[in-house]
C-alpha cells in the first residue's frame, strides 16, 4: 500500500514538473540550436502553372466521380487484406466522416481553379457531401463499449480500445468551417453548420485524454476519460481544428487546450522532432523519434504550437523543417504504397508508416503559408514537384491501403496541398 501511494505521489509531482517545464519552454525567446540546423536543399524548377492546375483538375474529377450516391466518400467494402484494427461500426463511421470531410475541403479549396462542367460537378458534389455531413455527422462518436477487447495488442498484451472518431471530429471541423464560409448570405444554412460544428467540438471535449491531448487507441484502463498515451500528431491535428472552430466563436475549455499543448511540448526534443506518443518520449533516439522518423509529424506539431503562441516556433524553425521534408523526402516516401500483409504499418526505416506521406505534405503547405510571402515560392515549387508526378492514372493519390478510404483521403489532402503551391 505504501509503495503504491508513493508511486502515485511521485507520478503526480513528475506531472507537475513536466507541465511547468513544458510551459516554460514555450515562452523562451529563441529555439535551441538543433532546431534550426539541417540540410539546405537547392531551389527546384517550378512546374508550369497549367500543369499544376491540370493535376488539381484531375484530382477533382476523381473525387466527383468516386462520390457515393449518399454523398459520402469511402466505405468498408474491400476484397483485400488489411492488418489494421477497425471494429464496426465505430471505426468505419470515423473513417467515412474523415475522408468525406477531406474531400469536401479539397473541392472547396480547388473551386477557384475550376470552370465549366468541372466546376459544376464540384459544386454539386459539395452540396451532396454537405447534406451527408449535416444528416449523419452526429452519428460519429467514440466506439461503443463492446469495442473493448476486440483484439489483444501483441506488444503490450493489453486490450485495445479504438478512438478513430477523433480523426473524424477534427476533419469534420475543417469541412464545416469551410462550408460555413461558403454559405455566406444564407444565415439558415450557416446556423445548421454551426450547430454541427458545436457537436464535433463537444465530442472532442468528451474524449480528451487524462494526460492531455488526444490519441486513437486507449490501451491502459479503458476508462470514460481515456487513460492511454496521447499521440503528438493526433493532438496537433485536433488543436488546429479547434483553432478554426474558435474563429466562428465555438469555444473549447482552456484547461483542456493547455493540457493538450503541454502534452505536445513534453514530446518535443531539442531538434524539434516529436515523439510519436508520450509512451515513447523517454526514448529520444529510437528511429521513429529521430528527425527522419518525425518528418510527417514535425510540420503539424510545429504549426499547432505556433498557432497557440509558442514563440520558439519561429520562421527559421519552419524553414528548417520544410528543408528537411524536401531534402529527406525519401525517408517519408519509403513506405508509401508498400503496406505488406501481416506487417506493422511501421515496418519501414525509422518506423515511418505510409499514411504519413500526404498528411505530412498537407500540413507542410499550411506551414508555408506562415512564412513571409517572398519565401513561399521556394517551398511551393518543391511540394508541387513532389506531388504532381505521384498522381495515379485515375487522377487519385494514395499512400496507405485502408479498405476503400485511402484514395479519397490521399486525393483530398493532395489537392488541398497543390492549391497552396500556386503562387499568388
Regions found by a protein language model. Give the residues of each.
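Bacterial N-terminal signal peptides
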Residues: 5-19
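Preference for long, amphipathic alpha-helical scaffolds in soluble/luminal domains
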Residues: 21-424
